[in-house]
Amino acid sequence: DRRQRQMCIRDRARMEYRGYDSAGVAVRSETKGLQVYKSKGRLQVLSDMIHGGADVEGTLGIGHTRWATHGEPNDINAHPHVSEDGRIAMVHNGIIENYMEIKQQLLRHGVTFKSETDTEVAAQLLEFHYNECHNMLEAVGRVLRRIEGSYAFGIICADYPNALIAARKDSPLIIG
């Protein structure tokens, strides 16, 4: 609903003091599936793009403001990152120390990447495990056991219309 859309933008604005180079939101809609909006620059750029949330349809969403650690600041590297099949959207704060090793393994399995980020590696790894076990919580558990470093993840999946999955280790996470 409209309140939820506005809350996603408002909560990103509250995080603005931390500094960032891009922002984005992913929202799940019954009619449109996962919709992802992201942009380089200040939060106002994203807000203008989606007319303050008025252009976004859905009732479940995740949002992120990014300070680049892997990959340059641009629209492609902005969060949320979406799995290859478009069913999973993920935001992440932290650093995945072994992301290059995981990326190389996924490349050998034919996975393609759009961004230069460790977060997209985590999103593609999640899709890989989800396709194997067909259970999102099990797939998330496999990802968390595989990655090294600090993280706070927010995850939504088109197959789970009312579920938001969150996990953290040594990084802050806001749920609201």
Question: What name fits each language-model region?
Answer:
Residues R3-Q6, R10-G176:
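Conserved short alpha-helical segments that host acidic/polar catalytic motifs at enzyme active sites
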